[in-house]
């Protein structure tokens, strides 16, 4: 591709990034607006503490509030119009109606409880993202502490699609130990609430806490969990995640490692994704940035394999591999024009780990392995059977390091919707 043509393509992608960022800021502002002019849902959730302090332990969740060191924005790409818009809107409404029939219950520890939103005690905000906010809450009937993702029902088709996709995937994935579990949902006229298991923190925040690399033995167990989660999504539900990155990988003090955030996942048709909407530019595979055949911009699960490879390099080295980039334009250009990142030889990584990452970051997607091949790799086989005390390592890191600071945190006196 000629340089001028490439620059034009990347400039268009960057323009779409900026547009998406404006939309994201608008959605967050909508959620955080506490002015009297905006009607409020009639939710009365008493706060655990009226002192205005945030719960110190509420750090992680299916959403992730701490911004990474370099802004990594959601990239909105042109979508192929294979479904009539009106039919798609009808399908969204039908799926929402189906899910609404299942609301009003929480299933925790194998027990099903009838519940409503007022049965939850708000312990404070855990974070906010493009879709809304996540709250730490206590289920009064049992005392269980859970994470509750709140998303506004704005009427915007794309936002509703994200809500539905996230709901659909987590509700169906109850039998996968490597995907964050959903306890139930509550739907009001203005909001959708998804009750999730409370995890400790995400890999992105762990990297920030440690201010350096995560050990290979931990990344080995993490790789096994994430590859199996992605393989499960593809084989069981025909879904591609499309947003694999450290902030969507959760860990907890029990040593569990799970994948989360399925709002921009896509359905696979003949094993290929037919839409190009959404994704994080920093982890996007070359074939998604610049499709080999622009008239058929299909891609498959190997795009997520690339994202996993970039994530592993970042976590293993403590640095994002495409350094010194001030804009997403620069990152996208480097992904297309430079050789793929590798694990540096001087940091003591095993040959199996280096080989696995190299396979994931094969630039030609046709030669990049799929999940079934990755599961046969000696790196995966080794860490499938090796005993690693992830729980003790996790608790040690959390005890000896400080939580990454977040800006613009609201005190409990200003938690919207829960007065």
Curated annotation (Swiss-Prot):
- Reaction it catalyzes: L-seryl-[protein] + ATP = O-phospho-L-seryl-[protein] + ADP + H(+); L-threonyl-[protein] + ATP = O-phospho-L-threonyl-[protein] + ADP + H(+); L-tyrosyl-[protein] + ATP = O-phospho-L-tyrosyl-[protein] + ADP + H(+)
Q: Name one GO biological process term.
A: cellular response to interleukin-1
Tell me which residues bear Phosphoserine: 271, 411
Region annotation (DVD domain) maps to: 377-400
**Residues where Phosphothreonine occurs?**
275
Q: Where is this site: Cleavage?
A: 44-45, 76-77
Which residue stretches, if any, does this entry annotate as coiled coil?
2-30
Task: Please tell me whether the keyword Protease is annotated for this protein.
Answer: no
This one is known as Dual specificity mitogen-activated protein kinase kinase 7
Q: Which organism is it from?
A: Rattus norvegicus
């Amino acid at each position: 591709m000629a340089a001028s043509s490439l620059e034009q393509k990347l400039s268009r992608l960057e323009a779409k990034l900026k547009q998406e960022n404006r939309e994201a800021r608008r959605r967050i502002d909508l959620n955080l607006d506490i002015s009297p002019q905006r009607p409020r849902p009639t939710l009365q959730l008493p706060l655990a503490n009226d002192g205005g302090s945030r719960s110190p332990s509420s750090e992680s969740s299916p959403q992730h509030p701490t911004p990474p060191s370099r802004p990594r924005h959601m990239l909105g790409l042109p979508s192929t119009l294979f479904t009539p818009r009106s039919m798609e809107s009808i399908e969204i409404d039908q799926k929402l109606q189906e899910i609404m029939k299942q609301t009003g219950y929480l299933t925790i520890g194998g027990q099903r409880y009838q519940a409503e939103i007022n049965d939850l005690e708000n312990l404070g905000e855990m974070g906010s993202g493009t879709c809304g906010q996540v709250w730490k809450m206590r289920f009064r009937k049992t005392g269980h502490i859970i994470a509750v993702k709140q998303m506004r029902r704005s009427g915007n088709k794309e936002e509703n699609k994200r809500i539905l996709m996230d709901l659909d995937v987590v509700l169906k994935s109850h039998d996968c130990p490597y995907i964050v579990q959903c306890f139930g949902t509550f739907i009001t006229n203005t909001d959708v609430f998804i009750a999730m298991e409370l995890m400790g923190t995400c890999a992105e925040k762990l990297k920030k806490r440690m201010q350096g690399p995560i050990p290979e033995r931990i990344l080995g167990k993490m790789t096994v969990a994430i590859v199996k989660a992605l393989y499960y999504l593809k084989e069981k539900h025909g879904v591609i995640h499309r947003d694999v990155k450290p902030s969507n990988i959760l860990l907890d003090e029990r040593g569990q490692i799970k994948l989360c955030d399925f709002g921009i996942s896509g359905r696979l048709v003949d094993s290929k994704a037919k839409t190009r909407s959404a994704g994080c530019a920093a982890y996007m595979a070359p074939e998604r940035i610049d499709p080999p055949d622009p008239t058929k911009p299909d891609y498959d699960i190997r795009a997520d394999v690339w994202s996993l490879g970039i994530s592993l390099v970042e976590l293993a080295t403590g640095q994002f591999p495409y350094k010194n980039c001030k804009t997403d334009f620069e990152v996208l250009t480097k992904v297309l024009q430079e050789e793929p990142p590798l694990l540096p030889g001087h940091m003591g990584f095993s040959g199996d780990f280096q080989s696995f990452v190299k396979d994931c970051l094969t630039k030609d997607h046709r030669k990049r392995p799929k999940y079934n091949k990755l599961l046969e790799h000696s790196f995966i086989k080794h860490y499938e059977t090796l005993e690693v005390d992830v729980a003790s390592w996790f608790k040690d890191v959390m005890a000896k390091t400080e939580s990454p600071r977040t800006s613009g945190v609201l005190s409990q006196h200003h938690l919207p919707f829960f007065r």
